[in-house]
């Protein structure tokens, strides 16, 4: 299957796969953290975790914005077809 880089072919499944992969990475990081520290965590480690969660939060916000824009465009197109 040819890869289409155009915004007209937004692949929601790839988007969700990306989120899932990132979350699995964070979960793996937490597992390693729990194993290696026996419950004691330094500030550098907490900063690293907070940074990863912030990236995930920003990504989810951008996905939400894309979905809102798609929804708005679909409503606009439906109204144009309907003639209202």
Swiss-Prot record:
This protein's superkingdom?
Bacteria
Q: Member of which family? A: Belongs to the chlamydial CPn_0710/CT_666/TC_0037 family.
- InterPro entries documented for this protein: DUF5407
- One Pfam family name is DUF5407
Q: What is the lineage of its organism?
A: Bacteria, Pseudomonadati, Chlamydiota, Chlamydiia, Chlamydiales
This chain belongs to the protein called Uncharacterized protein CPn_0710/CP_0036/CPj0710/CpB0737
